[in-house]
Amino acid sequence: MCFRSTLSATALALALAITISSAKAHDEAKYPNWKGQWRVVLTPGLEGQRVKFDPTKPWGKGQGAPLTPEYQKVHEDSMEDQKNGGLGNYPSATCHPGGMPRMMSTGEYEYVVSSDTTYILIGGEDHYRRIFTDGRPWPATIEPTYAGYSIGRWIDEDGDGKYDVLEVETRGPFKGPRAYDGTGLPLHSDNMSVFKERFYLDKTDPNVLHNMITVIDHALTRPWTVDKTYRRNTNARPAWREFYCVEGNVNLVIGKENYFMSADGLLMPTRKEQAPPDLRYFPWVKK
């Protein structure tokens, strides 16, 4: 009797395992294949300007951002400061996280898709994004982060029973300041941007992933939309780089001034006749 009960329990457990496994396999089949390593596709001739919002245009003013007059001035001041050795409006130069949308313009990406959450693994100072697809409502309060709070939904556009598109909305408040690119192309200082994205594979090339991303921000005169594309590495076992911004970063901000750190660990000016740091807390140093 005991043997029969054990056998029955084993058979039931096996049947449940097969059922769960089959259901899981069926669920996975509904989602697009985004496995592998993805990199931003850049227009030939612009490879040296990797980190920017619109990958088809030069960075800075060449992006054609619809900035308000106030934020055009912020951008111009940023570029002028950089010409004189400063960092301008670009906090990532001192290894602060870029946040949204810069974090979608950097290195290699990996997508981990489940039924309730999609993760975008980024690495470096931006780490990852978490996109909830479990049907949750927007929370009453959102803690400020660099990546923002993202809610998405899967869409079967052609009615074949498989998902084609992931629609995502990302809200703040964000941590800041943030910039689109290395010239300090700015987002508004209120850090209340909203981002709307549509991720989908190219219909003619499954190794190309589109991210149609729209920025709604008070520094803009209208929503700004670009098609960011990523190409999948055809190597089934790609190399994944380990990158930490602080390693080898020579920028050092003291007060509101940017200095360089030399290879032998000495402080260097970044522009002609730059004043040294305030040494008021070092009274033993001769003036």
Q: Residue locations for each model-derived region?
A:
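Bacterial N-terminal signal peptides
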Residues: A9-T19
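Compositionally biased, intrinsically disordered low-complexity segments
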Residues: T6, S21-A23
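PEST-like low-complexity, intrinsically disordered acidic/proline/serine-rich tracts
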Residues: A23-K287
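Bacterial N-terminal signal peptides that target proteins for export
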Residues: M1-A11
